[in-house]
Structure formats: C-alpha cells, structure tokens
Design a protein with these regions (language model features):
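Extended ligand-binding regions for polar small-molecule ligands
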Residues: 25, 65-74, 140, 145-146, ...
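Extracytoplasmic small-molecule ligand-binding "clamshell" domains
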Residues: 28-104, 251
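A ligand-binding cleft/hinge motif common to bilobed small-molecule-binding domains
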Residues: 105-113, 158-161, 185-188, 192-222
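Periplasmic-binding protein-like
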Residues: 46, 123-130, 198, 206-246, ...
Length: 263
C-alpha cells in the first residue's frame, strides 16, 4: 500500500513539474514569437482623443500613440496599431489578434480577472457633460433624463457598480460605439447628459468651438488609472513593457509626452 502511495506522489510531482515547465515555455514562446515578428500589435479605438485618434489626413496620433512608440523603441519592436471594436477588446486579446490593449484602458478588478496590466502611467476621472441650456447643474438633476455612455467603457462599469450616482436617477441610458457619436447626440439634444472619460472631454471641449455651451462635472466615482492590457500568459512581454515605462519615467521622456498632450 505504501509503495502505491509513494508511486502516486512521484507521478504527481512529475505532472506538476511538467505543467510548470510548459507554462514557462508558453510565456517565453509568446515573447519569442513577437520578437521574431518584430512588431507589437496594439489594439486601439482610433476616435478616443487625445489618446488615439485620426487627424484629417488619416494619420493616427495621440498620447498613447507617442507612448507606445517610445516603449516599442525601448524593447526593440515596431508598433502596429490596429483599430478594434472597443466592446470586443478583451476577446481580441484572448484570441491573439492583438498583443496588447493600449488606449486609455482603465485597470479594474473585473478586467484584472481576464487581463494582466502593466504599471499605470496616467490618471483619469469620469465626468458628466451637459448642455448649459438644459438647466442641469449637477448629476443629481439628471433624474428622469437620458444619459449617454460608451459601450465597454470604464464609465459604463461605474454606472453599474455605483447605481445610486446616476443609474437609478436617469430615465434611460443610450449606448454608443464612440464618444464622437455620443457628442453629436448631446449637441442635438437627443440625450441630456454624457458620462465620459475626463481626458477625452477636457481635450475635446478645449478644441471645440462649442465649448462654452457645455458644462462639466467630476462624478463621485473612484479615480482611475490607465495601464496597458496584456494577455495573462505573456509575462515576459509585461515585464519588458514595465521596464520600458520605468526607464521612460526616469529619463523624463514620459513627462515630456504628458506635457505635449496635457500641457
């Protein structure tokens, strides 16, 4: 009987050791695949100012674009920016069609169950934008009103996680694929308020001729931190990105990129 137990324990140790080695090989192989390819495939929403957006000539620019280029230079890769359906970002990452999510991507507990995160590199808040002529001066006055929010955004998560702030006040919620489309409806009066990332709203309104027509209010949701979303198995890639971010911070290059886009 004792021999059988010992034999079983030996087999168990061998199996566990094999799983551990296989896991390490998968992590290393994924990095080697990326390294051999020479590019980092980056999933973005190309309408999210000032993080990733298109100029009139179609060129992709933004804070995250500049930061991703700087990080890729540090780790010896070329960035390959791919526009994705933002509501499908985690699926794209899991399926391997992209290597990272890098587009004002907020680290949350729910997302951390599916995605690994780099160290944070920027803070953000959720705000409410309304038309001044609507007579809505704070979020409490959204009772019975129509609220716009982007599908798959951290604002949509906050709406569900903290229902007393807005969800239980508003009459209904309209989901949008992009903030651009949401702002069109807000201007036209088809929605009464827009739940939106502060970095987007501040930049968008600062560059809009209609900025005096709108009011902004920081909402009582927890402050957020933007990070790079990485497949959980890609630990080597995560370490490489973190090392690059640390180096950019120490050399002052990250500060220069922040100042360029956020003055």
């Amino acid at each position: 009987m004792m021999k059988k137990i010992i034999r079983f324990l030996c087999l168990l140790i061998i199996v566990l050791a094999s799983v551990g080695v296989a896991g390490c090989q998968r992590q290393e192989n994924s990095w080697q695949t990326i390294k051999s390819r020479g590019t980092l495939v980056i999933g973005v929403d190309d309408s999210f100012v000032p993080m990733d957006f298109r100029q009139k000539n179609g060129k992709l620019v933004g804070f995250d674009v500049d930061l991703a280029k700087a990080v890729c230079k540090e780790i010896g890769l070329k960035p390959d920016f791919q526009t994705i359906d933002w509501s499908m970002k985690e699926t794209e990452l899991r399926n391997g069609t992209i290597d990272v999510i890098w587009n004002g991507y907020t680290k949350t507990k729910a997302r951390a169950k599916k995605v690994a995160f780099s160290k944070p590199y920027l803070e953000n808040d959720q705000i409410l934008v309304t038309r001044k002529n609507k007579g809505i001066y704070n979020y409490r006055q959204m009772k019975g009103k129509i609220l716009g929010v982007q599908t798959g955004s951290s604002g949509a998560d906050d709406l569900d996680n903290y229902p007393k702030v807005l969800k239980k006040r508003v009459k209904s919620t309209v989901l949008y694929d992009t903030y651009n489309n949401a702002f069109i409806d807000l201007k036209a009066g088809r929605i009464d308020g827009l739940l939106i990332d502060g970095v987007y709203a501040n930049y968008y309104l600062a560059h809009s001729k209609y900025q005096k027509e709108f009011k902004k209010e920081k909402l009582p949701y927890p402050s957020e931190k933007f990070s790079v979303g990485i497949n959980k198995k890609d630990k080597t890639l995560k370490n490489k990105i973190n090392q690059a971010l640390n180096h950019l911070e120490k050399t002052g290059k990250l500060k220069k990129i922040r100042e360029k886009w956020f003055n």
